[in-house]
C-alpha cells in the first residue's frame, strides 16, 4: 500500500501512522500513480492527474461523471477502469458510499442558505427561525431522500417553516411520521413547485437520480416569480 505524503493530514492522520500500519509513503501524487495498480481517493481526478493515469489502472473514488463531460472523456481516453463510489449499490438499492456525503450536504445546505439571507452578504436580512413578533423563514426542500431529509431536519430545528416535496407518496408518509410539526409534506409536481417557490425564502435542491444528472425542476420562467433575494442551494 502506497500513500501520498501528507494525504491524511487534513483528516488528522500523520504519515507516521500510515507507516505504522505498514504503508509506504511516497513524496508526490505522480509517484503514487506510477507505482500503484489501484488508486483510492476521495474526489475525482483533476486535470493535472489525467496524464498520470495508466491504461487499465483501477480508480476508486467519487466521479459524478454525469456532471462532467470533460472528466468522462478523459477517463475513456486514458482507458482507466473507474469504480464510482456514488453508484455502488446494496441489494436494497441503497447507496452506502453516497449516504455519508449526502448527510453532510443536507445538513450544510440550510446553514449555507441562511448565510446568504443575512444582510452582510447582501441578503434580505431574514433569520431562519425568526424572532418574537417576526415570522420565521419559509424553506422549500425539493426531494425527500437523504439530502432532503437532513436539510429539512436542520431547517426545522432552527425554527423555519419547511415544505418538503417528493414524487413518492410512501416516502412522504414516512416523512410525515418523523418530522416535527413545522414541516409539511407535499407531492412534487410542476404546479406545486411553481406555487411554493413564490413564497419561499430558501430553496434546497435535493433530487437524486443515481448515476445521472439531477433534473431541472425550476425553470427560468419560474425564477421570475420568486421573491427578490430568494436563496437557492
Language-model segments: residues:
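Helical hairpin unit composed of two closely spaced alpha helices linked by a short loop
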Residues: 220-233
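Glycine-rich phosphate/diphosphate-binding loop of Rossmann-like nucleotide-binding domains
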Residues: 1-13, 122-208
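Structural alpha-helical scaffold elements that stabilize or flank donor/cofactor-binding regions
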Residues: 31-32, 52, 196-197, 222-225
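Residue-level detector of alpha-helix initiation sites
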Residues: 44, 104, 145-147
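Glycine/serine-rich phosphate-binding loop and adjoining beta1-alpha1 elements at the start
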Residues: 47-138
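Rossmann-like NAD(P)-binding element
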Residues: 30-47, 180-217, 231
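An N-terminal-biased, well-structured beta-alpha scaffold segment characteristic
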Residues: 1-74, 78
